[in-house]
Amino acid sequence: LHFLLRRQRQMCIRDRDADGRKIPGKVSEDCLFLNIYKPKNAKKLAPVLVWMHGGAFKHGSANEFDGSVLAAQQQVVVVTLNFRVGAFGFLDFSKFGSEYLGSASNGIQDCILALQWIQDNIEEYGGDPDNVTISGESSGGTMTLGLLGCPSAYSLYHKAIACLSLIHISEPTRHTSI
């Protein structure tokens, strides 16, 4: 197995856990990164699994999932990604001016940007850009379902697996184009 991560990156700024305890680990606004795990000695381009972390959209990190075993045993390139959480990822600032329209979708935009990077670069890591599956658990599963509804993401993945996802559908107060 070839593990490409050179060092653990910082997590996105986040809330405390459900019990109000501070979550350990270093945080930063400079937190958008990918971890890439690839099988060793692959003979052809491997399918790509993009994993989005859980954490109630308030905490979580790409570092929480080690894709090395999956990559080695299933001959798949595993990509874990960070996206902004809490207020940095999902707070709506549009009431402060039209320049902030869409601000409540920063976390989704982060995932779309990561998927664009994967499409453009994953072949360099042995991954097949024409065989990308998006997946996640808990809020990562909800993010997976959210990406199914984003026209700008349609060409960036080919399959989706949502694990333990909860989605609440309500009448939106405003429509945001993503």
Region annotations inferred by a language model:
Residues 1-9, 13-15, 167-178:
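Single conserved hydrophobic/aromatic residue that forms the stacking wall/gate
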